[in-house]
Amino acid sequence: EYISALVKKDVELVPISKKNISCVSSYTHTVEFGKNPILIGERINPTGKKRFKEALKNNDIDYILKEGIAQQEKGVHILDVNVGLPEIDEEKMLKTAVCELQAIINLPLQIDTSNASAMETALRRYNGKAMVNSVNGKQESMDTVFPLVKKYGGLVVALTLDESGIPQKAEDRVSIAERILDEAAKYGI
């Protein structure tokens, strides 16, 4: 009787579900946007980092992993992963970096590349809902990035620049942002 009464009560309960939550996740952790500031670790990026560039050229994945661990220990919420260097196979290195980082850290990752093939390879192997860095107001960028974000899920960082570069006026930047949002909506993003 007791269990039957519980079942009847349970049927009457309506689950609470939040709508329109923006979040990214790893296989174990979720980071929700809109509540508190989000810290994104940007050290896994060769721009201006001679030692990091050498590590990439030498296929030194341990260097990347140490950077990831150090940033996690410092308290970042999301880890940006950028291995773009002309001298290496970015697609192969990004795939390796994403897979290896996921094996040792529990932070959500931000896939940071303008190489569509590398982006898709990384997103396909990512265990969670990734952040993609980035799309911009150029039609070519939106036509490349949005289908991948739609296919694999995730959030996307939008940069307010277009074929003419970065506008000087705030109104022009807002116009680009609106164009990006309109295009994203076509993909259900």
Language model: regions and residue ranges:
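Domain-level signal for soluble alpha/beta catalytic cores
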Residues: 1-189
